[in-house]
Amino acid sequence: MRLSTAAALLTGFILAFSPAYDGCGPGRGYGKRRTPRKLTPLAYKQFSPNVAEKTLGASGRYEGKVTPSSERFKELTPNYNPDIIFKDEENTGADRMMTQRCKDKLNSLAISVMNLWPGVRLRVTEGWDEDGLHSEESLHYEGRAVDITTSDRDRNKYRMLARLAVEAGFDWVYYESKGHVHCSVKSEHSVAAKTGGCFPGRALVTMKDGSHRQIRDLQAGDLVLASEGSDGTGDLIYSEVLTFLDRRPITQKHFYVIRTEDGASVSLTAAHLLFMRVGNCSNRGEPKPGAVRTIFASDAQVGQCLLLGKLRKRFSQITHVGVREDQGLYPPLTAHGTVVVNDVLTSCYAAVNRQRLAHWAFAPLRLLYSWTGPDQVLKNGLHWYSQVLIGLGKLLLDSELFHPLALEATER
């Protein structure tokens, strides 16, 4: 009965209020296919995303050269896709060796190339490098990078080829030279964790009595420190924990570790939302209206100002961004849509960088719990409501609003 009631509430809210709907149909273009999104070719020397290749927002750090005798060589797999031509100048098959993630993206790109240019195939000129011919710390040494052209070597196609590579899911694409496009991916065991947004089980929240409790020990109905405004504004208050949007006690994942100059340190997955200061860190006092924005954890950079929430709200400059493996996945949902974790004010939401939209989307669930009380039984796994919203979001929202890893997780 509870499930059907909440489903009805969800449907009603979406049909009544969603700006993505027009008229009586289920969205823009009801009764006909959507017009395909026009692809914009990359310019010469342009790279996407617009950050350096070996930053966490792109393909991530260099992790060391992979050689045939190294333990990590087992991470590489040969690609024998007949729709891809491998130049293989060394005649060793080295260009065919790559990580599984790189292989998946390359195979996807090969299909796009044949669809756009019938009779033309994807061509790989450089893959894994075991000879040390590339620059220091090149991702070619790890099997995480490829240099590509088209089989007809028509350089007029390379700008669009770069765009197709972006669409295929490469984590960094660079129209590097007139002769090829460079593409790379995250490492297999880096932050390519296929999850939405979560905290590790040992993350600490602040209880109403001032004590700290590990997030894995939280129960529905507990009061935890949060922000009165779902957008990070307002006073610090104690908000009721309604449920967990996901709960996986024994899962091992890689988390971003973000530290500030004040000693605060929070661990969370790539797609989780954090509150940051708009602009520079010249004023690190309490946030004023319009001074707060959200970013994905994977976009956090040293020098940015993170919003803390200990005795009062204040900004603190980020001094370190790293990656660490930890156990457990726990994203709590509070009544106010925020929660202070390890003295850092964070969102309860992830996957889509629209805090107000996310808080609005969970309004039916909060309304349900206001009638029935918080979840009495906390089950492991992804909450059914989160699954519904992800499915609806993929139908209604532009894919560019999603974090790449969160969107990828829904497609598996």
Swiss-Prot record:
A lipid is attached at C24 (N-palmitoyl cysteine). The record marks T269 as: Involved in auto-cleavage. Zn(2+) binds at H140, D147, H182. One of its GO terms (cellular component) is Golgi membrane. Ca(2+) 1 binds at E89, E90, D95, T125, E126. CDD domains: Hint. Keywords: Autocatalytic cleavage, Calcium, Cell membrane, Developmental protein, Endoplasmic reticulum, Golgi apparatus, Hydrolase, Lipoprotein, Membrane, Metal-binding, Palmitate, Protease, Secreted, Signal, Transferase, Zinc. A lipid is attached at G197 (Cholesterol glycine ester). SMART domains: HintC, HintN. Its EC number is 3.1.-.-. The record marks D246 as: Involved in cholesterol transfer. Residues 1-23 form the signal peptide. GO terms for biological process: cell fate specification; cell-cell signaling; intein-mediated protein splicing; oligodendrocyte differentiation; positive regulation of smoothened signaling pathway; protein autoprocessing; regulation of gene expression; regulation of oligodendrocyte progenitor proliferation. The record marks H272 as: Essential for auto-cleavage. It comes from the Eukaryota. Interacts with BOC and CDON. Interacts with PTCH1. Interacts with glypican GPC3. This is Indian hedgehog B protein. It comes from Danio rerio. The gene is ihhb.
